[in-house]
């Protein structure tokens, strides 16, 4: 049906936040490299929400693709321990806003306030691994797991967020961005070859930080980070060294003096044996020998929470077909509009598209009102069922005009 919502423009930390009047009581809660997050009240649902502004998503093809990837992932990944997308809209200034559940805090802030008791460490780790089991089963690697990306509410319910850097499970990765403290050693050594095990390493670093109240590997720079990892784990084994792609990296690693590993039981003397054992299985140099999320869930340390009937996997693998595409901004824009329309369920349950007058109103609601002047013409897929050709004329201060042709 048609929308009667209007946009309201507000300044937050010097940034224009342009949202519909459905959302009120804006308060900034976080700022990242790609967007600003505010808490708000959803007056329609009567509940608090978090609104993430993606600034200038169509300024470059790289940013457009990144935003499209995050939106696709948020739509596909639906799990109790992952942040859930509740709404998405495009503002008149062409910024994109993701609306999700509001959690009270994040693990980074929680760790700064007080030490965690054993039962909280167990419960939080269990939820992290439960979420990772699902994510990995969908063929997705988070790639940037860290305490600030782990949200927690007053009931201690935990949700993993920020899938903007997530990637396909592929042994030949290109490029990597993460917070240094939680970065797996294979990233530093091989750069282009990594898999879901990088998330297990990050989770292990977070596990240790929850136990001790401080980062386990607080590297100051890349080389220092690797050095303090070897202080605990010893020199990398031959199976890891032979995977190093860079000649300079190989020369650096082989030039280092040999270091023996420190037994985890000695390093974590005050920690219960089951916790030390699980930590030792997560923080292993060789990713092939690192424990999986599914296996970690059945470890004795997590026995108080483990429930094999309530640790689901994804129903389907995430479709990464778009990921290698090198497309212009306008094409990413069309694809983004398609995903927004799909999210707002323009099509019926059978995937058919309603082309009557009400459809135009629904399109206007989904794309959130006036747009920049632009002709878009592209083959896209609505509801992943009927291939269609959609011609969209978006005119400032006018309803979008849509022509739908079934192929």
UniProtKB/Swiss-Prot annotation:
Catalytic residues (UniProt): 144
Binding sites annotated in the UniProt record for ATP: 29-37, 52
Required cofactor(s): Mg(2+)
Top-level taxon: Eukaryota
Entry's Gene Ontology cellular component terms: cytoplasm; nucleus
Biological processes annotated in GO: stress-activated MAPK cascade
Name of this chain's protein: Mitogen-activated protein kinase HOG1
Gene name of this polypeptide: HOG1
């Amino acid at each position: 049906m048609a929308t009667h919502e209007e946009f309201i423009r507000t300044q937050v930390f010097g940034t224009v936040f342009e949202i519909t009047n459905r959302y009120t009581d804006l308060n900034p809660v976080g700022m990242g490299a790609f967007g600003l997050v505010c808490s708000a009240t959803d007056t329609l649902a009567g509940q608090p929400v978090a609104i993430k502004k993606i600034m200038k998503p169509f300024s470059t093809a790289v940013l457009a693709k990144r935003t499209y990837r995050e939106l696709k992932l948020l739509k596909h990944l639906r799990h109790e321990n992952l942040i859930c997308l509740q709404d998405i809209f495009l503002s008149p200034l062409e910024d994109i806003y993701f609306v999700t559940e509001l959690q009270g805090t994040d693990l980074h802030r929680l760790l700064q306030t007080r030490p965690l008791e054993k039962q909280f460490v167990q419960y939080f780790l269990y939820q992290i691994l439960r979420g990772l089991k699902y994510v990995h089963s969908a063929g997705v690697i988070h790639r940037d797991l860290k305490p600030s990306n782990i949200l927690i509410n007053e009931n201690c319910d935990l949700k993993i967020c920020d899938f903007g850097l997530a990637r396909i499970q592929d042994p030949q990765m290109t490029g990597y961005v993460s917070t240094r403290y939680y970065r797996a050693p294979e990233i530093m050594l091989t750069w282009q070859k990594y898999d879901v095990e990088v998330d297990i390493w990050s989770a292990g670093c977070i596990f240790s930080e929850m136990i001790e109240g401080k980062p386990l590997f607080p590297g100051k720079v890349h080389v220092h980070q690797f050095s303090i990892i070897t202080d605990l784990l010893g020199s990398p084994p031959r199976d890891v060294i032979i995977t190093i792609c860079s000649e300079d990296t190989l020369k650096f690693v082989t030039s280092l003096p040999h270091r023996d590993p420190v037994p985890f039981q000695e390093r974590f003397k005050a920690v219960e044996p089951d916790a030390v054992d699980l930590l030792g299985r997560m923080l292993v140099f060789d990713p092939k020998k690192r424990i999986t999320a599914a296996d970690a869930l059945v470890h004795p340390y997590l026995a108080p929470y483990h429930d094999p009937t309530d640790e689901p996997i994804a129903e389907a693998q995430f479709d990464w077909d778009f990921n290698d595409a090198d497309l212009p901004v306008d094409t990413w824009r069309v694809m983004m509009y398609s995903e927004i329309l799909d999210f707002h369920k323009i099509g019926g349950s059978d995937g058919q598209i309603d082309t009557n007058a009400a459809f135009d109103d629904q399109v206007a609601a989904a794309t959130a009102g006036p747009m920049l002047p632009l002709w878009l013409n592209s083959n896209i897929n609505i509801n992943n069922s009927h291939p269609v050709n959609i011609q969209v004329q978006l005119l400032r201060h006018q309803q979008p005009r849509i022509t739908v042709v079934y192929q």
